[in-house]
């Protein structure tokens, strides 16, 4: 992806080795250029691997934290991804999984065929209880759960109703939402926190191996 989660981690951590994986050579090259500035600022080191998340070239039981954010809904055999994330995670360490929440995602599918048929887009909608059973199969212990980004639900539903086209209002809203994710803007945070429990765009699962 565009590396926003790596950037967010980089702002919060120091002296850490942060690894990103993407199957696109173009994306990896772009990220290598973008992250050179972050390396100097935070004394973090970054490594970018070209590869498939269903077969990760990282040693078993080697990672202190694994983040798999908004990935499982894109891949045909998502269980292979979960198994790989589990394999590389150190015992006792934490895995963060996030997927689109059922309600807002269902509305986007309902309102827009284009949303459903986007190349490389979402091919399934997860239900919370189903995913919890998948985690149990791997003996991952769920210790925290919440929903986030309710305002992103608003953005994507409005865009779905607009045949996936971005008008000026939606463009401005999206720019502000991205800034908010990095703490650079404050958009009705109180309202969003009130909406998150039932309308958050992402469901976040915190799991321990």
Regions found by a protein language model. Name each.
Residues 53, 121, 126, 200-202:
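A conserved catalytic-core signature of glycosyltransferases
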Residues 129-146, 208:
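A SAM-dependent methyltransferase catalytic signature shared across enzymes that methylate proteins
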Residues 36-38, 113-116, 160-164:
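Short, hinge-like loop/turn segments at secondary-structure boundaries
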Residues 44, 110, 147-209:
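A C-terminal cap/extension of S-adenosyl-L-methionine-dependent methyltransferases
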Residues 1-108, 130-132, 205-209:
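Conserved SAM-binding loop
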Residues 113-130, 146-149:
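Acceptor-substrate binding/catalytic loop of class I
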């Amino acid at each position: 992806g565009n590396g926003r989660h790596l950037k967010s981690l980089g702002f919060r951590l120091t002296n850490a080795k942060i690894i990103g994986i993407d199957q696109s050579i173009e994306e990896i090259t772009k990220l290598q250029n973008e992250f050179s500035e972050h390396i100097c600022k935070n004394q973090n080191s970054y490594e970018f691997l070209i590869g498939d998340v269903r077969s990760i070239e990282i040693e078993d039981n080697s990672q202190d934290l694994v983040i798999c954010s908004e990935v499982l809904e894109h891949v045909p055999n998502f269980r292979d991804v979960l198994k790989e994330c589990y394999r590389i995670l150190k015992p006792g360490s934490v895995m963060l999984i996030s997927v689109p929440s059922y309600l807002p995602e269902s509305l986007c599918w309902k309102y827009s065929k284009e949303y459903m048929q986007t190349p490389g887009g979402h091919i399934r909608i997860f239900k919370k209880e189903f995913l919890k059973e998948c985690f149990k199969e791997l003996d991952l212990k769920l210790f925290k759960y919440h929903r986030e980004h309710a305002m992103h639900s608003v953005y994507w539903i409005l865009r779905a109703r607009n045949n996936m086209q971005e008008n000026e209002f939606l463009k401005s809203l999206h720019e502000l939402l991205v800034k908010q994710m990095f703490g650079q803007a404050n958009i009705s945070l109180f309202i969003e926190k009130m909406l998150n429990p039932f309308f958050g765009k992402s469901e976040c699962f915190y799991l321990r191996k």
